C-alpha cells in the first residue's frame, strides 16, 4: 500500500496527522520558508508523544541549498542531535554551485546519520540533471527522494516522476508539492509508492489586538495573523483513497 507522509510544523499538527491516518511525518519549522530545522523543544516533544515514524528536516535557512562551511557544520550537529533523540530518519539536501548533488558533503551527512533513513528533499528539484542526481544519490545510499518532478507542483511533474521511478534500482521516489485528495489517485495509478502532502490550511489568529502597521517578517506582505495547521479531514480523506486503491 502506498505510504502517506504529512508535513507538520508543530506538535499539534503531528498529533492531528497521526490521529487521521498518516504513515509518517516530516517535521519542520517555518512554513513560510518552505521548512527549516525544528527547535530542540519541538523535536523532543514530538519524539515523546508521536508513535508513527517522524523524520525531521535538517535545513538551516531558507533559499538555495549551497551552504557555507559554518552552515554545514551546524547541519551535522543537528543530525547528531536527531540521531541521539532516536528519530528513525531525517530529511535534508545539499548542492554544489553548479546544481549537482554535493557528494562530498553527502558522504559526511550519511556518516553522521548512521542507521537513520535519509530522504533527499526538494533540493533535488533544483538539480541541473535529475537523472544524474538520482544515480549519485543511489550511490550515496539515500533511502528516498522527495520531488515534484522539477516542476512547480507534482501534478505538472508527474511524467518526470514516472521516468525517475522507472530507473529501477534507485531510492524510493516520493511525490510531493501540491499533492491533495483531488489529484492523489493520479499518483497512485502512476505507481508512486510514497506521497507527501501538507494537507494544511491557514487559520486566522485568535489575537484581538492587532498592530496592522507592523510586520515581524522581512516580507511586508506576510500575514502576521494567520497560522498554518494540518487539516485532519484532509489527511483522513487521502488515507481513505489510498486504502480503497489498494483494495482494488
UniProtKB/Swiss-Prot annotation:
Record has Cytoplasm as a keyword: yes
Q: Which Pfam families match?
A: CutC (PF03932)
Record's GO cellular component, any one? cytoplasm
MF terms in GO: copper ion binding
Under InterPro entries, the record lists: CutC-like, CutC-like_dom_sf
Q: Which UniProt keywords apply?
A: Cytoplasm
Cellular compartment(s)? Cytoplasm
Gene3D superfamilies linked to this entry: Copper homeostasis (CutC) domain
Kindly report the protein's main subcellular placement as a broad class.
cytoplasm
Signal peptide stretch = none
Q: Which family does it belong to?
A: Belongs to the CutC family.
Subunit composition? Homodimer.
The molecule here is called PF03932 family protein CutC
The organism encoding this protein is Salmonella heidelberg (strain SL476)
Amino acid at each position: 500500500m502506498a505510504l502517506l507522509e504529512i508535513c507538520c510544523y508543530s506538535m499539534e499538527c503531528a498529533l492531528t496527522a497521526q490521529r487521521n491516518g498518516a504513515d509518517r511525518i516530516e517535521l519542520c519549522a517555518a512554513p513560510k520558508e518552505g521548512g527549516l530545522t525544528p527547535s530542540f523543544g519541538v523535536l523532543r516533544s514530538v519524539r515523546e508523544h508521536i508513535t508513527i515514524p517522524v523524520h525531521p528536516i535538517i535545513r538551516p535557512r531558507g533559499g538555495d541549498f549551497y551552504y557555507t562551511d559554518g552552515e554545514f557544520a551546524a547541519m551535522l550537529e543537528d543530525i547528531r542531535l536527531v540521531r541521539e533523540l532516536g528519530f528513525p530518519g531525517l530529511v535534508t539536501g545539499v548542492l554544489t554551485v553548479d546544481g549537482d548533488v554535493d557528494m562530498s558533503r553527502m558522504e559526511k551527512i550519511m556518516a553522521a546519520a548512521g542507521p537513520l533513513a535519509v530522504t533527499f528533499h526538494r533540493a533535488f528539484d533544483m538539480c541541473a540533471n535529475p537523472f544524474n542526481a538520482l544515480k549519485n544519490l543511489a550511490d550515496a545510499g539515500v533511502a528516498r527522494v522527495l520531488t515534484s518532478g522539477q516542476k512547480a507542483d507534482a501534478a505538472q511533474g508527474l511524467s518526470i516522476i514516472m521516468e525517475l521511478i522507472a530507473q529501477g534500482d534507485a531510492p524510493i521516489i516520493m511525490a510531493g508539492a501540491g499533492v491533495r485528495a483531488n489529484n492523489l489517485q493520479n499518483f497512485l495509478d502512476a505507481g508512486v509508492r510514497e506521497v507527501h502532502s501538507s494537507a494544511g490550511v491557514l487559520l486566522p489568529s485568535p489575537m484581538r489586538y492587532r498592530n496592522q502597521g507592523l510586520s515581524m517578517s522581512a516580507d511586508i506582505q506576510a500575514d502576521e495573523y494567520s497560522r498554518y495547521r494540518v487539516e485532519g479531514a484532509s489527511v483522513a480523506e487521502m488515507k481513505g483513497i489510498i486504502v480503497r486503491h489498494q483494495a482494488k
